[in-house]
């Protein structure tokens, strides 16, 4: 299945991912309309999704509690540095990440990818993967999977995994057992300083993402001081983290996410009725915008139309 969509906002992509059981919220971190392509394939034990976009996108809520969703990127250009982050793990051409989806709580993972790469998710049934790891005594792999966010692979297995997925995401999955074998081979690669990464800021980053999407705090126009208190960090540290990982400040990030969520609810008439959000003003207040005029201006800047035109 291949989907190509030119969009004004990334809600359509969320809907496509929902068909794979991923209730993922997506925020575009730069202005203007976008274009993305998505290819997907699945069998009983394995699902694949390859996404390419011309805008930087933030994904929140990935993971269904049943599968472990291994992620990697394929560069479109020879660029130095990170192409994005998966649960805070830096994504380069040798990265394999997404280990945080081992958590049984759905929607616990996040990722951010720029427009210079495509990202691929390989979703393997968790119970079967654990059985295979234990049966072949892959104890190093088990330790990495349960203790790390990702690894850098320098063996042939990751390249083979990428080639297999690139072929079968469009042609259909023919060798589901091969994905388990190759992932285990990646996890069992001997540990070196080159393929390990200190998980600095992992917990803080997850708190930032959770706070930005929290329905409990969505109605409150949080100040920078309140955000720092919630995350238990200094303004200087929070600024450095957000600039490094998101390319913007925390308030700007939260504002963009709230705009996306307000648009999501504005386009869903059933949800509006259930929440008793009968007017644009009701929706603006629900998502922390107390001044309707400012909300309308920010909405127009983000989506190219006024709330009344949606």
Regions of interest found by a model, annotated:
Residues 1-33, 70-72, 78-218, 223-225, ...:
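Alpha-helical bundle regulatory/interaction domains
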Residues 32-33, 38, 42, 46-65, ...:
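Conserved short histidine dyad/triad with adjacent acidic residue
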Residues 54-58, 75-80:
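A short acidic, glycine/proline-enriched capping/turn motif at secondary-structure boundaries
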Residues 238:
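Helix-turn-helix DNA-binding module
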Residues 241, 245-261, 265-266, 294, ...:
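Alpha-helical DNA-contacting segments of helix-turn-helix folds
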């Amino acid at each position: 299945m291949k989907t190509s969509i030119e969009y004004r906002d990334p809600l359509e992509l969320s809907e496509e991912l929902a068909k794979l059981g991923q209730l993922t919220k997506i925020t575009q971190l730069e202005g203007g309309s976008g274009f993305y392509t998505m290819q997907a394939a699945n069998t009983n034990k394995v699902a694949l999704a390859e996404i390419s976009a011309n805008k930087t996108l933030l994904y929140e809520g990935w993971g269904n509690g049943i599968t472990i969703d291994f992620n990697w990127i394929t560069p479109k250009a020879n660029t130095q540095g990170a192409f994005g982050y998966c649960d805070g793990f830096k994504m380069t051409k040798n990265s394999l990440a997404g280990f945080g989806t081992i958590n049984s709580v759905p929607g616990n993972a996040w990722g951010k990818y720029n427009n210079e790469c495509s990202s691929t998710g390989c979703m393997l049934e968790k119970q079967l993967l654990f059985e295979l790891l234990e049966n072949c005594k892959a104890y190093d792999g088990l330790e990495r999977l349960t203790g790390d966010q990702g690894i850098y692979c320098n063996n042939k297995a990751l390249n083979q995994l990428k080639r297999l997925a690139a072929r079968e995401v469009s042609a259909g999955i023919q060798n589901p057992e091969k994905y388990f074998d190759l992932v285990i081979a990646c996890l069992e690669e001997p540990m070196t300083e080159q393929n390990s990464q200190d998980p600095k800021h992992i917990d803080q980053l997850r708190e930032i993402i959770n706070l930005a999407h929290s329905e409990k705090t969505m109605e409150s126009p949080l100040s920078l001081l309140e955000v720092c208190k919630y995350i238990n960090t200094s303004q200087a540290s929070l600024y450095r983290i957000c600039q490094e990982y998101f390319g913007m400040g925390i308030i700007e990030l939260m504002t963009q996410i709230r705009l996306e969520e307000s648009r999501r609810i504005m386009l869903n008439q059933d949800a509006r009725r259930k929440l008793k959000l009968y007017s644009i003003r009701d929706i603006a207040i629900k998502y922390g915008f107390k001044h309707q005029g400012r909300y309308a201006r920010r909405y127009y800047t983000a989506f190219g139309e006024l709330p009344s035109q949606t």
